[in-house]
Protein backbone atom coordinates (compact mmCIF):
# COMPACT_ATOMS: atom_id res chain seq x y z
CA UNK A 1 0.00 0.00 0.00
CA UNK A 2 1.41 3.37 -0.98
CA UNK A 3 2.08 6.06 1.66
CA UNK A 4 -0.49 8.38 0.06
CA UNK A 5 -3.19 5.72 0.15
CA UNK A 6 -2.27 4.66 3.69
CA UNK A 7 -2.42 8.28 4.88
CA UNK A 8 -5.81 8.68 3.22
CA UNK A 9 -7.13 5.56 4.97
CA UNK A 10 -5.84 6.70 8.36
CA UNK A 11 -7.38 10.13 7.85
CA UNK A 12 -10.66 8.55 6.85
CA UNK A 13 -10.63 6.27 9.89
CA UNK A 14 -9.93 9.25 12.17
CA UNK A 15 -12.87 11.18 10.75
CA UNK A 16 -15.14 8.12 11.07
CA UNK A 17 -14.17 7.55 14.71
CA UNK A 18 -14.57 11.26 15.38
CA UNK A 19 -18.05 11.26 13.85
CA UNK A 20 -19.07 8.26 15.95
CA UNK A 21 -17.66 9.91 19.08
CA UNK A 22 -19.48 13.17 18.36
CA UNK A 23 -22.75 11.29 17.83
CA UNK A 24 -22.30 9.46 21.13
CA UNK A 25 -21.62 12.74 22.91
CA UNK A 26 -24.50 14.69 21.35
CA UNK A 27 -26.97 16.37 23.64
CA UNK A 28 -26.90 19.36 25.94
CA UNK A 29 -24.59 19.36 28.93
CA UNK A 30 -26.62 19.83 32.11
CA UNK A 31 -26.21 19.95 35.87
CA UNK A 32 -27.57 17.38 38.33
CA UNK A 33 -26.74 16.98 42.01
CA UNK A 34 -23.89 19.51 41.85
CA UNK A 35 -22.09 17.92 38.93
CA UNK A 36 -22.13 18.14 35.14
CA UNK A 37 -23.84 15.42 33.18
CA UNK A 38 -24.25 14.47 29.54
CA UNK A 39 -27.00 12.11 28.45
CA UNK A 40 -27.52 11.08 32.06
CA UNK A 41 -23.85 10.28 32.75
CA UNK A 42 -21.21 12.28 34.65
CA UNK A 43 -19.29 14.74 32.48
CA UNK A 44 -15.74 15.69 33.45
CA UNK A 45 -13.31 17.41 31.13
CA UNK A 46 -10.00 19.00 30.42
CA UNK A 47 -10.15 21.97 28.10
CA UNK A 48 -8.59 25.19 26.96
CA UNK A 49 -9.04 28.86 26.20
CA UNK A 50 -8.57 30.28 22.70
CA UNK A 51 -10.09 33.75 22.87
CA UNK A 52 -9.10 34.61 19.29
CA UNK A 53 -11.16 32.08 17.32
CA UNK A 54 -13.90 34.41 16.01
CA UNK A 55 -11.43 37.25 15.39
CA UNK A 56 -9.27 35.04 13.17
CA UNK A 57 -12.20 33.23 11.51
CA UNK A 58 -13.61 36.58 10.34
CA UNK A 59 -11.06 36.26 7.52
CA UNK A 60 -11.84 33.09 5.54
CA UNK A 61 -8.20 32.88 4.47
CA UNK A 62 -7.17 32.38 8.13
CA UNK A 63 -9.81 29.87 9.17
CA UNK A 64 -7.37 26.99 8.83
CA UNK A 65 -5.85 28.19 12.14
CA UNK A 66 -9.17 27.61 13.89
CA UNK A 67 -9.45 24.17 12.31
CA UNK A 68 -5.88 23.31 13.33
CA UNK A 69 -6.40 24.18 16.99
CA UNK A 70 -9.76 22.42 17.30
CA UNK A 71 -8.53 19.31 15.49
CA UNK A 72 -5.31 19.09 17.52
CA UNK A 73 -7.20 19.71 20.76
CA UNK A 74 -9.70 16.98 19.94
CA UNK A 75 -6.88 14.57 19.10
CA UNK A 76 -5.32 15.34 22.49
CA UNK A 77 -8.62 14.54 24.21
CA UNK A 78 -9.62 18.11 25.06
CA UNK A 79 -13.38 18.50 24.99
CA UNK A 80 -14.23 22.08 26.06
CA UNK A 81 -13.04 25.43 24.69
CA UNK A 82 -13.77 28.87 26.10
CA UNK A 83 -13.74 31.76 23.62
CA UNK A 84 -15.16 35.22 22.94
CA UNK A 85 -18.54 35.88 21.35
CA UNK A 86 -17.79 39.60 21.41
CA UNK A 87 -15.61 42.15 19.66
CA UNK A 88 -16.86 45.66 20.32
CA UNK A 89 -15.46 48.38 18.09
CA UNK A 90 -11.95 48.33 16.67
CA UNK A 91 -10.39 45.84 14.27
CA UNK A 92 -12.73 43.12 12.98
CA UNK A 93 -15.49 44.31 15.30
CA UNK A 94 -18.49 42.03 15.62
CA UNK A 95 -20.52 44.87 17.13
CA UNK A 96 -19.56 48.10 15.37
CA UNK A 97 -21.91 50.21 17.48
CA UNK A 98 -24.87 49.29 19.72
CA UNK A 99 -26.99 46.82 17.76
CA UNK A 100 -24.98 47.24 14.53
CA UNK A 101 -23.10 44.09 13.50
CA UNK A 102 -20.61 43.07 10.84
CA UNK A 103 -22.05 39.98 9.16
CA UNK A 104 -18.57 38.95 8.02
CA UNK A 105 -17.45 38.61 11.65
CA UNK A 106 -20.70 36.90 12.63
CA UNK A 107 -19.99 34.31 9.95
CA UNK A 108 -16.59 33.84 11.58
CA UNK A 109 -18.37 32.90 14.82
CA UNK A 110 -20.68 30.63 12.84
CA UNK A 111 -17.59 28.87 11.49
CA UNK A 112 -16.09 28.46 14.96
CA UNK A 113 -19.25 26.78 16.24
CA UNK A 114 -19.53 24.56 13.15
CA UNK A 115 -15.88 23.46 13.40
CA UNK A 116 -16.17 22.82 17.13
CA UNK A 117 -19.13 20.54 16.43
CA UNK A 118 -17.15 18.78 13.71
CA UNK A 119 -14.34 17.95 16.14
CA UNK A 120 -16.46 17.20 19.18
CA UNK A 121 -15.40 20.24 21.20
CA UNK A 122 -17.94 22.05 23.41
CA UNK A 123 -17.83 25.84 23.65
CA UNK A 124 -18.22 28.32 26.48
CA UNK A 125 -19.04 31.67 24.85
CA UNK A 126 -18.54 34.99 26.64
CA UNK A 127 -20.70 38.06 25.94
CA UNK A 128 -18.45 40.99 26.95
CA UNK A 129 -15.09 41.87 28.46
CA UNK A 130 -14.10 43.61 31.69
CA UNK A 131 -10.89 44.68 29.96
CA UNK A 132 -10.36 47.01 27.02
CA UNK A 133 -9.22 44.20 24.74
CA UNK A 134 -11.80 43.74 21.99
CA UNK A 135 -13.75 46.74 23.32
CA UNK A 136 -15.02 45.67 26.70
CA UNK A 137 -17.18 47.68 29.05
CA UNK A 138 -15.14 50.81 28.25
CA UNK A 139 -16.41 50.64 24.67
CA UNK A 140 -20.01 50.46 25.90
CA UNK A 141 -19.37 53.55 28.03
CA UNK A 142 -17.83 55.35 25.05
CA UNK A 143 -20.87 54.51 22.91
CA UNK A 144 -23.20 55.91 25.55
CA UNK A 145 -21.20 59.09 26.02
CA UNK A 146 -21.02 59.56 22.27
CA UNK A 147 -24.84 59.38 22.27
CA UNK A 148 -25.00 62.17 24.87
CA UNK A 149 -25.52 60.01 27.96
CA UNK A 150 -23.84 61.28 31.14
CA UNK A 151 -21.60 58.51 32.47
CA UNK A 152 -19.18 59.26 35.32
CA UNK A 153 -17.01 56.11 35.16
CA UNK A 154 -16.70 52.74 33.47
CA UNK A 155 -18.16 50.88 36.45
CA UNK A 156 -21.57 52.42 35.73
CA UNK A 157 -21.66 49.60 33.20
CA UNK A 158 -23.25 47.56 36.00
CA UNK A 159 -25.91 50.08 36.99
CA UNK A 160 -26.80 52.50 34.19
CA UNK A 161 -30.00 51.48 32.36
CA UNK A 162 -28.67 52.54 28.94
CA UNK A 163 -25.54 50.42 29.31
CA UNK A 164 -27.56 47.46 30.53
CA UNK A 165 -29.86 47.91 27.54
CA UNK A 166 -26.87 47.83 25.19
CA UNK A 167 -25.66 44.56 26.72
CA UNK A 168 -29.08 42.95 26.62
CA UNK A 169 -29.24 43.80 22.95
CA UNK A 170 -25.96 41.96 22.39
CA UNK A 171 -27.07 38.99 24.50
CA UNK A 172 -29.76 38.44 21.88
CA UNK A 173 -27.02 36.91 19.71
CA UNK A 174 -28.15 33.65 21.34
CA UNK A 175 -31.08 33.69 18.90
CA UNK A 176 -28.89 33.94 15.78
CA UNK A 177 -29.33 31.29 13.09
CA UNK A 178 -25.94 29.85 12.20
CA UNK A 179 -25.33 30.48 8.49
CA UNK A 180 -23.38 27.20 8.17
CA UNK A 181 -25.21 24.68 10.36
CA UNK A 182 -28.66 26.32 9.97
CA UNK A 183 -29.18 25.77 13.72
CA UNK A 184 -29.93 28.68 16.05
CA UNK A 185 -27.25 29.19 18.67
CA UNK A 186 -29.81 28.66 21.44
CA UNK A 187 -30.62 25.23 19.99
CA UNK A 188 -27.05 24.08 19.35
CA UNK A 189 -25.70 21.56 21.88
CA UNK A 190 -22.15 22.33 20.70
CA UNK A 191 -22.38 25.31 23.04
CA UNK A 192 -21.86 24.12 26.61
CA UNK A 193 -22.57 27.44 28.29
CA UNK A 194 -22.89 31.18 27.99
CA UNK A 195 -20.74 33.49 30.10
CA UNK A 196 -22.04 36.89 31.19
CA UNK A 197 -18.65 38.61 31.21
CA UNK A 198 -14.96 37.83 31.17
CA UNK A 199 -13.67 38.64 34.66
CA UNK A 200 -16.17 41.25 35.90
CA UNK A 201 -14.70 43.74 38.37
CA UNK A 202 -16.19 46.81 40.05
CA UNK A 203 -13.70 49.23 41.56
CA UNK A 204 -16.57 51.45 42.74
CA UNK A 205 -17.92 48.85 45.19
CA UNK A 206 -15.46 46.34 46.57
CA UNK A 207 -18.16 44.51 48.53
CA UNK A 208 -19.46 42.79 45.40
CA UNK A 209 -23.05 43.84 46.11
CA UNK A 210 -23.45 46.12 43.08
CA UNK A 211 -22.36 43.44 40.62
CA UNK A 212 -24.52 40.87 42.39
CA UNK A 213 -27.79 42.73 42.99
CA UNK A 214 -27.77 45.26 40.19
CA UNK A 215 -26.35 43.25 37.37
CA UNK A 216 -25.80 39.47 37.59
CA UNK A 217 -29.38 38.72 38.61
CA UNK A 218 -30.86 40.93 35.90
CA UNK A 219 -28.60 39.72 33.10
CA UNK A 220 -28.87 36.07 34.10
CA UNK A 221 -32.65 36.25 34.10
CA UNK A 222 -32.57 37.89 30.68
CA UNK A 223 -30.33 35.20 29.19
CA UNK A 224 -32.56 32.44 30.53
CA UNK A 225 -35.65 34.17 29.11
CA UNK A 226 -34.10 33.76 25.65
CA UNK A 227 -32.36 30.42 26.10
CA UNK A 228 -33.23 27.93 28.83
CA UNK A 229 -31.41 25.01 27.20
CA UNK A 230 -27.85 26.09 27.86
CA UNK A 231 -25.93 26.46 31.09
CA UNK A 232 -24.97 29.93 32.28
CA UNK A 233 -22.04 31.19 34.33
CA UNK A 234 -20.83 34.63 35.41
CA UNK A 235 -17.19 34.57 34.27
CA UNK A 236 -15.73 35.33 37.68
CA UNK A 237 -12.13 35.00 38.84
CA UNK A 238 -13.16 33.79 42.29
CA UNK A 239 -12.36 36.75 44.52
CA UNK A 240 -14.26 36.70 47.78
CA UNK A 241 -16.33 39.67 48.98
CA UNK A 242 -18.25 40.66 52.09
CA UNK A 243 -20.73 37.77 52.33
CA UNK A 244 -18.24 35.60 54.27
CA UNK A 245 -15.62 38.05 55.59
CA UNK A 246 -13.15 35.39 56.76
CA UNK A 247 -12.95 33.99 53.23
CA UNK A 248 -11.37 37.27 52.07
CA UNK A 249 -8.16 36.02 53.68
CA UNK A 250 -7.92 33.54 50.81
CA UNK A 251 -7.77 36.35 48.24
CA UNK A 252 -4.30 37.26 46.93
CA UNK A 253 -4.14 40.40 49.08
CA UNK A 254 -6.96 42.44 47.57
CA UNK A 255 -10.60 42.53 46.40
CA UNK A 256 -11.98 43.41 42.97
CA UNK A 257 -15.64 44.24 43.62
CA UNK A 258 -17.08 40.76 43.20
CA UNK A 259 -18.21 38.14 45.70
CA UNK A 260 -17.68 34.51 44.75
CA UNK A 261 -20.37 33.30 47.15
CA UNK A 262 -23.25 35.71 46.60
CA UNK A 263 -22.67 36.08 42.86
CA UNK A 264 -22.97 32.32 42.38
CA UNK A 265 -25.93 31.72 44.69
CA UNK A 266 -28.24 33.25 42.07
CA UNK A 267 -30.58 30.51 40.83
CA UNK A 268 -30.07 31.25 37.14
CA UNK A 269 -26.31 30.74 37.44
CA UNK A 270 -25.66 27.04 36.84
CA UNK A 271 -22.01 26.65 37.80
CA UNK A 272 -19.17 28.56 39.42
CA UNK A 273 -15.82 29.56 37.95
CA UNK A 274 -12.45 30.65 39.21
CA UNK A 275 -9.32 31.92 37.46
CA UNK A 276 -5.73 31.87 38.72
CA UNK A 277 -2.50 33.54 37.61
CA UNK A 278 -0.06 33.11 40.45
CA UNK A 279 2.87 34.61 38.53
CA UNK A 280 0.85 37.84 38.23
CA UNK A 281 -1.13 37.87 41.47
CA UNK A 282 1.79 36.69 43.63
CA UNK A 283 4.69 38.11 41.64
CA UNK A 284 7.88 38.12 43.66
CA UNK A 285 6.98 34.99 45.60
CA UNK A 286 8.79 31.70 45.02
CA UNK A 287 7.40 28.96 42.79
CA UNK A 288 6.83 26.85 45.90
CA UNK A 289 4.82 29.61 47.59
CA UNK A 290 2.77 30.15 44.45
CA UNK A 291 1.95 26.44 44.19
CA UNK A 292 0.95 26.29 47.85
CA UNK A 293 -1.36 29.28 47.43
CA UNK A 294 -2.80 27.79 44.23
CA UNK A 295 -3.70 24.57 46.01
CA UNK A 296 -5.42 26.53 48.78
CA UNK A 297 -7.26 28.73 46.22
CA UNK A 298 -8.68 25.74 44.36
CA UNK A 299 -9.61 23.76 47.47
CA UNK A 300 -11.30 26.72 49.18
CA UNK A 301 -13.58 27.31 46.20
CA UNK A 302 -14.22 23.60 45.76
CA UNK A 303 -15.36 23.40 49.39
CA UNK A 304 -17.66 26.39 48.94
CA UNK A 305 -19.07 25.09 45.66
CA UNK A 306 -19.77 21.74 47.31
CA UNK A 307 -21.08 22.88 50.70
CA UNK A 308 -22.63 26.30 50.09
CA UNK A 309 -23.36 26.77 46.40
CA UNK A 310 -24.06 23.11 45.64
CA UNK A 311 -23.03 23.73 42.04
CA UNK A 312 -20.22 22.48 39.80
CA UNK A 313 -16.91 24.35 39.81
CA UNK A 314 -14.64 25.00 36.83
CA UNK A 315 -11.10 26.36 36.88
CA UNK A 316 -11.90 28.42 33.79
CA UNK A 317 -8.55 30.16 33.34
CA UNK A 318 -5.11 29.31 34.63
CA UNK A 319 -1.61 29.38 33.28
CA UNK A 320 2.01 30.23 33.82
CA UNK A 321 4.11 32.27 31.44
CA UNK A 322 6.62 30.27 29.42
CA UNK A 323 9.02 33.16 29.97
CA UNK A 324 9.65 31.62 33.38
CA UNK A 325 10.91 28.51 31.56
CA UNK A 326 9.13 25.51 30.04
CA UNK A 327 10.19 23.27 32.92
CA UNK A 328 8.74 25.64 35.49
CA UNK A 329 5.47 25.82 33.57
CA UNK A 330 5.24 22.04 33.26
CA UNK A 331 5.73 21.60 37.01
CA UNK A 332 3.04 24.20 37.70
CA UNK A 333 0.53 22.68 35.28
CA UNK A 334 1.13 19.15 36.57
CA UNK A 335 0.46 20.33 40.12
CA UNK A 336 -2.73 22.17 39.15
CA UNK A 337 -4.02 19.22 37.14
CA UNK A 338 -3.28 16.85 40.00
CA UNK A 339 -5.32 19.02 42.37
CA UNK A 340 -8.23 19.24 39.92
CA UNK A 341 -8.24 15.48 39.36
CA UNK A 342 -8.03 14.63 43.05
CA UNK A 343 -10.92 16.94 43.93
CA UNK A 344 -13.01 15.54 41.07
CA UNK A 345 -12.22 12.03 42.30
CA UNK A 346 -13.20 13.00 45.84
CA UNK A 347 -16.71 13.54 44.55
CA UNK A 348 -19.10 16.35 43.93
CA UNK A 349 -18.44 19.60 42.28
CA UNK A 350 -15.08 19.83 40.46
CA UNK A 351 -15.89 19.59 36.76
CA UNK A 352 -12.65 20.40 34.98
CA UNK A 353 -10.13 23.04 33.99
CA UNK A 354 -9.34 25.27 31.01
CA UNK A 355 -5.71 26.21 30.44
CA UNK A 356 -4.84 29.65 29.06
CA UNK A 357 -4.25 29.32 26.11
CA UNK A 358 -3.89 27.32 22.87
CA UNK A 359 -2.63 28.87 19.63
CA UNK A 360 -2.07 27.65 16.09
CA UNK A 361 1.25 27.63 14.28
CA UNK A 362 2.34 31.03 12.99
CA UNK A 363 0.47 33.12 15.58
CA UNK A 364 3.50 34.60 17.33
CA UNK A 365 1.96 38.08 17.20
CA UNK A 366 -0.83 36.82 19.50
CA UNK A 367 1.58 35.32 22.05
CA UNK A 368 1.12 36.78 25.53
CA UNK A 369 3.69 34.48 27.09
CA UNK A 370 1.06 31.92 28.05
CA UNK A 371 0.52 30.52 24.57
CA UNK A 372 0.83 26.80 23.89
CA UNK A 373 1.01 25.27 20.42
CA UNK A 374 0.20 21.58 20.69
CA UNK A 375 3.05 19.65 19.12
CA UNK A 376 5.58 22.48 19.39
CA UNK A 377 5.63 22.10 23.18
CA UNK A 378 5.82 18.28 23.45
CA UNK A 379 6.25 17.97 27.22
CA UNK A 380 3.43 20.43 27.91
CA UNK A 381 1.24 18.77 25.28
CA UNK A 382 1.73 15.40 26.99
CA UNK A 383 0.75 16.82 30.38
CA UNK A 384 -2.40 18.40 28.93
CA UNK A 385 -3.38 15.26 27.02
CA UNK A 386 -2.79 12.98 30.01
CA UNK A 387 -5.10 15.13 32.12
CA UNK A 388 -7.79 14.97 29.45
CA UNK A 389 -7.69 11.19 29.34
CA UNK A 390 -7.68 10.58 33.09
CA UNK A 391 -10.59 13.01 33.58
CA UNK A 392 -12.57 11.16 30.91
CA UNK A 393 -11.69 7.82 32.49
CA UNK A 394 -12.76 9.14 35.89
CA UNK A 395 -16.12 10.20 34.48
CA UNK A 396 -16.63 6.70 33.08
CA UNK A 397 -15.72 5.08 36.40
CA UNK A 398 -18.13 7.35 38.29
CA UNK A 399 -20.85 6.35 35.85
CA UNK A 400 -20.42 2.70 36.83
CA UNK A 401 -20.38 3.17 40.59
Curated annotation (Swiss-Prot):
Q: Which GO terms describe its biological process?
A: polysaccharide catabolic process
- Cited Gene3D superfamilies: Glycosidases
Q: State where it is primarily located.
A: secreted
State the superkingdom. Answer: Eukaryota
**Top class in the EC scheme:** hydrolase
Q: Which residues form the active site?
A: 199 (proton donor), 317 (nucleophile)
Report residues binding substrate: 84, 198, 277, 356
Q: What is its EC number?
A: 3.2.1.78
State the signal peptide span: 1-24
**Any idea which UniProt keywords this protein has?**
Glycosidase, Hydrolase, Secreted, Signal
UniProt xrefs under InterPro entries:
Glyco_hydro_5, Glycoside_hydrolase_SF, MAN-like
Which Gene Ontology cellular component terms are annotated?
extracellular region
Q: Where in the cell is it found?
A: Secreted
Provide the catalytic activity annotation. Answer: Random hydrolysis of (1->4)-beta-D-mannosidic linkages in mannans, galactomannans and glucomannans
Q: Which Pfam families match?
A: Cellulase
List the GO molecular function terms. Answer: mannan endo-1,4-beta-mannosidase activity
**The family this protein is said to belong to:** Belongs to the glycosyl hydrolase 5 (cellulase A) family.
PANTHER family in alphabetical order: MANNAN ENDO-1,4-BETA-MANNOSIDASE 1, PTHR31451
Q: What is this protein called?
A: Mannan endo-1,4-beta-mannosidase 3
Recorded source organism is: Solanum lycopersicum
Amino acid sequence: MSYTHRRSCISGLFLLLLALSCEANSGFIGVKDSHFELNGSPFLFNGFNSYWLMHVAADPAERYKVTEVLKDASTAGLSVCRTWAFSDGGDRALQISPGVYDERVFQGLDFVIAEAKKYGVRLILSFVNQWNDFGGKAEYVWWARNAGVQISNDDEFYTHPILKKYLKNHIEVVTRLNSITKVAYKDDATIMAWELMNEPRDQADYSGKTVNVGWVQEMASFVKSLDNKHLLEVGMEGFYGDSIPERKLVNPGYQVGTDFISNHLINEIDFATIHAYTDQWLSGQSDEAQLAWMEKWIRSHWEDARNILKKPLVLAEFGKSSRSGEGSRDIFMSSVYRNVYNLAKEGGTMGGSLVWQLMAHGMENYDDGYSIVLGLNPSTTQIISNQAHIMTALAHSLNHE
